[in-house]
């Protein structure tokens, strides 16, 4: 394989044994593809597919007026250009969006004509609000903050059959039910009650007999019975009663008479149970008629009404039970044929027949009225109203939609072959659902598993945005209908009819405040990616935490390869919020699919198919790690497989599919944990979750022991700068990279230059620091897709969340008791876990009733010293180091005029004293914060004069833009002249500056000319002259284009900012805070091994090895066995080997060994100890040297999950590094120099510093605010609150009998207002006594008791 620019600089030793059949897909595809389909940006009218915005418009339009004389049709839409780019939106706090313009056509029909002749057509583009755009990393910028829309896992539309698991009725009888769930519209439930009648509920309202619904659909009793039952036909001839025999129906019954064949031979004796053998004999004998006694009919149900042959009068209605009296009437009327329902107790119960018996309605109208009463209780029903209501419930496309998914699931479940059909229900649909339900009750068929991923689908961003958009459009539709009637008479245009506010409001509400629109977790690249790949069962139309039971949260066999079984939050959301598996994707119906390799006759092919949970059920699927021979055939006699959602073993020839990769089971975060296979699942869960909380360190450090997924995550997360096109690095500095694009990648008319501006010290959503550092040097050749700059937590294009620390597992003076961590001072000195946090502080100047607030350096009653960090505009300098209480932005607010004494008035008149009528409301640094000002932004309202600071910031930004554009022009111009030089040198000239006719042009001549003079040359070859003219035109066009671009940017910068009403100016100050690691900070490994730093010891006191190398961290070995995360020990061993190999390479470099020796040693590391072979021969000597230099700190290893390094390989690596194979060494106590009594496990573990810093939690209150009602101090760090002295603490003091301390706690230290002030006065006077009074909260209690109407008085002595 060819290595990329960064890969060949540092190759990871890969221990995987299985080949890569398929690359890991782009990890953000689920977000980007979904929203791309929703917008269909760039599609022409003909190319629009029936999805997304287009589908939403088509479902609501055309809108026809109430009279039918005017209609508004939808033609198409187009998206405009965004006003600001992403970075500008974040700065200005606006939404990154594009205007949506819809072309609609207003048609007015001629009222007089009979055939609706068209009288007038008007077409117009209407503005329909703004649609947020997705950034290239799958996020949205809403009001300046980056947000993610999480995908939702919800119950798929369709029909589901279930039972109550015996919970409803005390007998434990299973009550079956069916539920038709549409995509939008009313739910329809059918359910059995304990008496085996079928009921129907609409939208979970009160139940009605199911036959009411069938009657309302227009079925008569007889048609209903015909649909559900077969009939037995009896012929009456005089005194004999003959049954038309269907032998199968007799099975299981007891013969009430002897059953004989045609010859009179008895087949079944009276009183015997009829078995399958008897039935076979009857079929062979060809018995078609069976004589039965008349009482055989008693208790049977009539299937067709019995009519008097002579008079035509109805003797018995259908669905009536036959009794003796009825039989007598039948005999008297000489009826010759009776049809009864065939029912039995085993597999054909009389459920529908029983339901009809309890049904009080007898015709369609009564049934419709009954349904109307249930849906609209209290309203008087009319025939029309009842019909309209029922028609709208399930049969109107506007109110009811199963959607394509719903129809597909519906048809599949009830056994139809076609998967497409209408979105509304039909009579047949309802009958078929009832038939299936009755079959399941009869024991034919099974109920559905609601947690099966074939019954749950994923709703992505695009689909949810489309639904919201439709909601907005439906609101618009109502208003448009009202106005259309006016349009006929008043000649309105489409623009006057459509008010886009409801649409804009619906979209804004969805992106701004929906439960699934979340503030992006931007701690580090992994947390971003995981957030975008999250799948939540909560949210609108989903579950709620309280109602979700264990089953929904549990891991289901169908999760395999679709949803990660490991990564989910701990706590109330466990199992409801999941993460997509590495290779999973959604299909067109929204079901999750996983890829598999096709296996034919035990030969594994490279053909890959994606299957959903339903499609894979019948396949026999082998694991990715199944043993294959050289030809790719399965060799084991029995292969471990998955079949019908069970794990089992099968012969190789039965296998039909095979997993693509061992990591397809887990999510991205879990696939980053090396030796995951050796960790307990609970700890792996914590490990996956804690990696997302790692704070990016000052200098990222790649993990020595990784899994090979680090590069994918860093590349796909979007925090690195990736080359859009290949080329040569023209210039590079800390803030940008300029690439001169290779000629073969430049398309005509495009500039052959790419400028990448790097993000420097920017604040993330979590206040961590986003900073990019270039990796390339001037003159380097890069290809498309190479990584040009590292972002936060990335090191040479690999994810690097923490630091490699030398750890020893040993108890140490109790400092690492219970997961505490003992750190060496060296870690702090080397800034290994130093992180930068950026805080944004905002100062807003408003227009108040008494006058405008002013931002100024002239602040009353403030000394010079406090102002020395402010400029003349009153804003702090960039680079100032500030601490708590320092003024960042000086601001004064006018305060109300006070009554002045005559003397004051006189002084005021003489000295022009103005200071007393404003108060100081400056922005100060909050308590507990100290840092450096790294940036200031000033936003000024239109029409308000800009201050000097705002103007200087604007000038700086313009200079930067101008610099970029000049650079671009310089490169384009340079490339053009290079091409011209190649064409001109050696060609003959006709004329030119200081040139004779016919002279050959040389390099020296061209160098002597100014570039503008080149175009004055006249060549003998006309093609060359044409080339010169084209080049001149091209250069001037580019210049013009860039000037226009500059003017556009300048206009944007100089226009006023769109601020909230009443706001004149906003100043944002950004503080960078450096946080070193300190006791109380939380740290963790990748295996769920978390702990808190308890002590930082001097280096000389730490345990060290025989060479004197001290360890960085001492961990407690007791944290391993009970937690069963042995992965951390294996990681430590392999880390030791990796570091040892690096040191060996370092020694070779220091001894200046030959490159061949180095190459040989690298070959030993990479290609002789298991795992994947690396092709080192394609690297030149210089590249080998560069690689060796990068490996000095340790040879990075990859041990992919479920396919990682084996114990023997770790030992071999340790041996190669000349280290003990046990991974243990003798350590010495740094304080005494004595050797510890047994060898200790020492190695390198990758440790993370989590975003739970003691600085953010530690807090102490001095004098602060009090609660208004209880007069007690507030609680919490944010309110500068006190410590709660709670109920249990009071008990403790009571138990000790510390009465005075307790009294002090409950009165003067809390809410005794008078006592507090008195105590303050006493202390000032040097008197340290206290007098306790009445606590305020006691007065509140008395007031509350009085409010209950109980008079309570305190007796005074």
Curated annotation (Swiss-Prot):
EC number: 2.7.7.6
Description of how the protein assembles with itself and partners: The RNAP catalytic core consists of 2 alpha, 1 beta, 1 beta' and 1 omega subunit. When a sigma factor is associated with the core the holoenzyme is formed, which can initiate transcription.
Presence of the UniProt keyword Transcription in the record: yes
InterPro entries the UniProt entry points to: DNA-dir_RNA_pol_bsu_ext_1_sf, DNA-dir_RNA_pol_bsu_external_1, DNA-dir_RNA_pol_su2, DNA-dir_RNAP_su2_dom, DNA-dir_RNAP_su2_hyb_sf, RNA_pol_bsu_bac, RNA_pol_bsu_CS, RNA_pol_bsu_protrusion
Domain of life: Bacteria
Signal peptide: none
Name assigned to this protein: DNA-directed RNA polymerase subunit beta
Reaction equations catalysed: RNA(n) + a ribonucleoside 5'-triphosphate = RNA(n+1) + diphosphate
One example of a Gene Ontology biological process annotation: DNA-templated transcription
GO cellular component: DNA-directed RNA polymerase complex
Function noted in UniProt: DNA-dependent RNA polymerase catalyzes the transcription of DNA into RNA using the four ribonucleoside triphosphates as substrates.
A Pfam family assignment: RNA_pol_Rpb2_6
CDD domains in UniProt: RNA_pol_B_RPB2
Similarity section: Belongs to the RNA polymerase beta chain family.
Record-level Gene Ontology MF annotations: DNA binding; DNA-directed RNA polymerase activity; ribonucleoside binding
HAMAP family, per database record: RNApol_bact_RpoB
PROSITE patterns noted in UniProt: RNA_POL_BETA
UniProtKB keywords: DNA-directed RNA polymerase, Nucleotidyltransferase, Transcription, Transferase
UniProt entry tagged with the keyword Transferase: yes
Taxonomic source organism: Pseudomonas paraeruginosa (strain DSM 24068 / PA7)
